[in-house]
C-alpha cells in the first residue's frame, strides 16, 4: 500500500450512496450527488482512502492486494488462484468466502460489483485507471443494504486536459505479464455545456502461476464518458468488460504444503478450471435543481457467464440427487438508484438525502458430470451428462433516508435508515426418478438504522460515537447446496443480523492523519461454512458471534518528498454459541480471521528522478476450522521497490523494479475454511521479482 495525502482527498459524508468524482483541481476532488463535501478527518466513521496514483507506484497493477494491505480492518489475501478471486474481509465479514467476495458491498463507479444476493468480485477493476478506492468500515456500511459488513467504493479517473495516452507493462516471476493502454482527456474544463471528458483503458494479463495448474489469462476493458448537458446537469456513461480463463490448483493438506507447496495433485487429475465472461454498462444523470436541491439517477445492466470444473470423484456424482461436478451459470442483472438531496434549516442546518434502490438478477444454473466414460473408466475434466437445471431469481427494493444535523459549531448528528427487502425464487427444471421437484422461494426483510455523534475537540481533532444494525442474506451460491447431500436448495439457511457500536478519534498532524477506532459487533445467525470439499461448499447458521477490536492508522508526508504509512489491527472474533457437532466450540476463534495485522512503509518519491521505498506486512495466525485444530502460521513479509521517472516536454517515462518477500518466507497466503479433507492451505510464493515501464504522452 502506498501513502496518500490527507489534504488531497475529500469524501462525501459517510460515503453513502456511491459517490462519483465530478470535477477536480490540484488539491481536492469535488464529489457530487452527496449531502455535503467533507474531509476524511470530518467523516464520523472509520474510513480509509487510497489514491490511484499511489496504488500504481512501482506495482504490477494486477491485484488489489498489492495496494490495500495497509488499510486497517481490511484483510486482503492473494490466493494465488485466479479462478477464485482475492480473499477479502472487513472486520472479519467475508472471511468464510471460498471464492469471490462475500459480506462486503463493492461498487465501481456507482455500479454494484456485488450482486443483489451479496456475492461480489473484484476481477473487473482496472487498476490502471482507478482514481481512488474508499473503504468504509463500521455501522454506516449498513446503509448500503444487504451484505454490508463493510463497503469498498472504486472510482475511475475523470478525464482532464490535456489529452494523454499511456502505455504500461509489467513482467514478473512465474511468467506473469501485464500490458495495457489508457487514453484520457477532456474538451473544456467540465463546467460549460457540451464539455466532454473521457477515460478509456484496456489491459491483458497472463501468468503460468506460482503453483502447478494455476495459469491464467485475463482481458479487461474499462471506459468512462462524461458530458456536460447544461450548467446544472451532467450525464455519465460507464462501460466494463472482463474475460478470464483460469486453472484452479485447489487447497493442500499441511503435509502436502510442507512437502511441496507448488503441487496441485487433484487439480491436475480433474483438470479443475473456471471461465468468466462479464459485460456491463451504466448511465448516471446528475442535476442541480437549485442552490439547496440536487438529484441523481443511476441505471445499469450486465450479464455474466461462468463455467467451473470441480474435483469431485465419479462415485458421489452417480447418486441420482447429486448435481454433478461442472457448474454453468448465466446471469443477467440490472438496477436503478434514484435519490434527492435537500439542504435547509430546521432550527439548525440540516441535510436530507432520500432515495429508492431496486436491483434484480436472473440466473440459469446447470450442473453436469465432470467426466465421460471411456471403456468404463472416467475421463475427468470433460462435461458429461446433465445433472441440474434450474432458474433462480433474486431481487430487492430498498428505500433509504439519511439526515445530517449541525447541532452546534462543534457538535453534529448523522442518522439514517434503510428498509431492505430481498426476495428469492427458484424453479427446478430437472425432475427425474430419485431427484424430485426442488423449487422453492424465500424472502427477507429488515430495518437498518445507523447514527453517529461527532464532536470537534479542535479544528484538527474530532471524536465520534456511532452505532448501527447490519443485515446479510444468503447468496444464491450459499443456498445452492444442502449439507445432507440431497438435491435442492438450502432454504433453511437464514439471514444474519449484526449490531455494531464504535468510538473513534481522528487527528490532523501537519500533512498527515492519525486515526483510532474501537468497536464491537454482535451477530445473530452468522452464516458460516458447514463443509467444503472438491470446490463445493455448504453453509449453516452459527448462532451468535462477537467481533471486537481496535484499528490504528497513521499516514504522513514529510518535507523532502518522504512518506510514511503505518497501521495495526487487533480483531478478536469468536463464537458465542456452539457450532460444532462433536465438541463444544463456544469461545473458539472464528476461522479465516487474523487476530493481529500490521503494516508499515516508508518511501522517497519526488516528482521526477530516482525514487525508492520499502514496506513490511505482518499477518497473525489464522484458524482454518471451527474446532481450532488447524491453522495457518503467522508471517512477516518485506518488499522493496525503486525506479526512475523522467519528464521531458510532453513525454513521461517511468521505469521501475521490485522484489517481494525479500527474505524468502514460506507461508500460507489464505485458507479454505472448514475444508472437509483437511486441504485448508493455499500457499504463496517465496522471493519474487518484477520490472515495469510506463510511458505517457500529453497532447499539448
Swiss-Prot record:
What is a biological process (GO) this protein takes part in?
Answer: siderophore transmembrane transport
Keywords linked to the UniProt accession: Cell outer membrane, Membrane, Receptor, Signal, TonB box, Transmembrane, Transmembrane beta strand, Transport
Q: Where is the signal peptide?
A: 1-23
Membrane-crossing segments per the record: 132-136, 150-160, 162-171, 177-186, 195-204, 220-227, 233-241, 280-288, 295-301, 335-344, 350-358, 398-405, 411-419, 447-456, 464-468, 500-509, 511-520, 549-556, 563-570, 597-604, 611-617, 637-647, 651-659, 689-697
PROSITE patterns hit by this protein: TONB_DEPENDENT_REC_3
Q: One GO cellular component from the entry?
A: transmembrane transporter complex
What happens when the protein's gene is inactivated? The PTS-PqqU-deficient strain displays growth defects at low PQQ concentrations. However, the mutant can grow at high PQQ concentrations, probably due to diffusion of PQQ across porins.
Among the GO molecular function terms of this UniProt record, one is:
siderophore uptake transmembrane transporter activity
Domain comment from the record reads as follows: Possesses a conserved positively charged substrate-binding pocket.
Function of the protein: Mediates the TonB-dependent high affinity transport across the outer membrane of pyrroloquinoline quinone (PQQ), a redox cofactor required for the activity of Gcd and Asd dehydrogenases. The uptake process is energised via the TonB-ExbBD complex. Not involved in the transport of an iron-containing substrate under laboratory conditions.
Which family, according to UniProt?
Answer: Belongs to the TonB-dependent receptor family.
Protein name according to UniProt: Pyrroloquinoline quinone transporter
Q: Which organism is it from?
A: Escherichia coli (strain K12)
Amino acid at each position: 500500500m502506498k501513502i496518500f495525502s490527507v489534504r488531497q482527498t475529500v469524501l462525501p459524508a459517510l460515503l453513502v450512496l456511491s459517490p462519483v468524482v465530478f470535477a477536480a483541481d490540484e488539491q481536492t476532488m469535488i464529489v457530487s450527488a452527496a449531502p455535503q463535501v467533507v474531509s476524511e478527518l470530518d467523516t464520523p466513521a472509520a474510513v480509509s482512502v487510497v489514491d490511484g496514483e499511489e496504488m500504481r507506484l512501482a506495482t504490477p497493477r494486477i491485484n488489489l492486494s498489492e495496494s490495500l494491505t495497509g488499510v486497517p480492518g481490511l484483510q486482503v489475501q492473494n490466493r494465488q488462484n485466479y479462478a477464485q478471486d482475492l480473499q477479502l474481509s472487513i472486520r472479519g465479514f467475508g472471511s468464510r468466502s471460498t471464492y469471490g467476495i462475500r459480506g462486503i458491498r463493492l461498487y465501481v463507479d456507482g455500479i454494484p460489483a456485488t450482486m443483489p444476493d451479496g456475492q461480489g468480485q473484484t476481477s473487473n477493476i482496472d487498476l490502471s485507471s482507478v482514481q481512488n478506492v474508499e473503504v468504509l468500515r463500521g455501522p454506516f456500511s449498513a446503509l448500503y443494504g444487504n451484505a454490508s459488513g463493510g463497503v469498498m467504493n472504486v472510482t475511475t479517473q475523470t478525464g482532464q486536459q490535456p489529452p494523454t495516452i499511456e502505455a504500461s507493462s509489467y513482467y514478473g516471476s512465474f511468467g506473469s505479464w501485464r500490458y495495457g493502454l489508457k487514453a484520457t482527456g477532456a474538451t473544456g474544463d467540465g463546467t460549460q455545456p457540451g464539455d466532454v471528458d473521457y477515460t478509456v483503458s484496456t489491459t491483458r494479463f497472463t501468468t503460468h502461476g506460482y503453483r502447478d495448474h494455476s495459469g491464467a489469462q485475463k482481458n479487461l476493458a474499462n471506459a468512462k464518458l462524461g458530458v456536460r448537458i447544461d450548467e446544472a446537469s451532467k450525464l455519465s456513461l460507464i462501460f466494463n468488460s472482463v474475460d478470464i480463463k483460469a486453472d484452479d490448483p485447489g487447497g493442500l493438506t499441511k503435509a502436502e504444503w510442507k512437502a511441496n507447496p507448488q503441487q496441485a495433485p487433484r487439480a491436475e487429475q480433474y483438470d479443475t478450471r473456471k471461465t468468466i465472461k462479464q459485460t456491463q454498462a451504466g448511465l448516471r444523470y446528475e442535476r442541480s435543481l437549485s442552490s439547496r436541491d440536487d438529484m441523481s439517477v443511476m441505471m445499469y445492466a450486465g450479464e455474466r457467464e461462468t463455467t467451473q470444473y470441480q474435483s469431485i470423484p465419479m462415485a458421489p456424482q452417480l447418486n441420482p440427487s447429486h448435481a454433478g461436478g461442472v457448474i454453468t451459470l448465466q446471469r443477467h442483472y440490472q438496477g436503478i438508484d434514484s435519490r434527492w438531496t435537500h439542504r435547509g434549516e430546521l432550527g439548525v442546518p440540516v441535510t436530507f438525502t432520500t432515495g429508492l434502490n431496486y436491483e434484480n438478477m436472473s440466473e440459469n444454473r446447470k450442473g453436469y458430470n465432470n467426466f465421460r466414460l471411456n471403456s468404463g473408466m472416467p475421463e475427468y475434466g470433460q462435461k458429461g451428462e446433465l445433472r441440474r437445471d434450474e432458474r433462480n431469481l433474486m431481487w430487492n427494493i430498498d428505500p433509504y433516508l439519511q439526515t445530517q444535523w449541525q447541532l452546534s459549531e462543534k457538535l453534529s448528528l448523522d442518522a439514517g435508515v434503510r428498509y431492505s427487502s430481498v426476495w428469492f425464487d427458484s424453479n427446478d427444471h430437472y425432475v427425474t426418478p430419485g431427484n424430485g421437484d426442488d423449487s422453492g422461494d424465500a424472502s427477507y426483510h429488515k430495518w437498518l438504522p445507523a447514527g453517529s455523534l461527532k464532536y470537534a475537540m479542535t479544528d484538527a481533532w474530532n471524536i465520534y460515537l456511532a452505532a448501527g444494525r447490519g443485515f446479510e442474506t444468503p447468496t444464491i451460491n450459499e443456498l445452492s447446496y444442502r449439507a445432507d447431500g440431497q438435491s435442492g436448495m438450502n432454504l433453511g439457511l437464514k439471514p444474519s443480523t449484526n449490531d455494531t457500536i464504535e468510538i473513534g478519534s481522528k487527528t490532523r498532524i501537519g500533512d498527515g492523519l492519525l486515526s483510532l477506532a474501537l468497536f464491537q459487533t454482535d451477530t445473530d445467525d452468522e452464516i458460516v461454512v458447514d463443509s467444503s470439499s472438491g470446490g463445493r461448499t455448504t453453509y449453516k447458521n452459527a448462532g451468535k458471534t462477537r467481533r471486537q477490536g481496535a484499528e490504528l492508522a497513521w499516514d504522513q508526508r514529510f518535507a523532502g518528498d518522504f512518506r510514511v504509512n503505518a497501521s495495526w489491527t487487533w480483531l478478536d472474533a469468536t463464537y458465542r454459541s456452539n457450532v460444532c457437532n462433536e465438541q463444544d466450540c463456544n469461545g473458539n476463534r472464528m476461522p479465516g480471521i487474523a487476530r493481529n495485522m500490521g503494516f508499515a512503509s516508508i518511501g522517497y518519491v519526488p516528482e521526477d528522478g530516482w525514487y525508492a521505498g520499502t514496506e513490511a506486512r505482518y499477518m497473525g495466525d489464522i484458524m482454518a476450522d471451527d474446532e481450532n485444530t488447524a491453522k495457518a502460521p503467522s508471517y512477516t513479509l518485506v518488499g522493496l521497490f525503486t525506479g526512475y521517472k523522467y519528464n521531458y516536454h510532453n513525454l513521461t517515462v517511468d521505469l521501475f523494479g521490485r522484489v517481494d518477500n525479500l527474505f524468502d518466507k514460506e507461508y500460507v497466503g489464505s485458507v479454505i475454511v472448514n475444508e472437509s479433507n483437511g486441504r485448508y492451505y493455499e500457499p504463496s510464493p517465496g522471493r519474487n521479482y518484477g520490472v515495469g515501464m510506463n510511458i505517457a504522452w500529453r497532447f499539448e
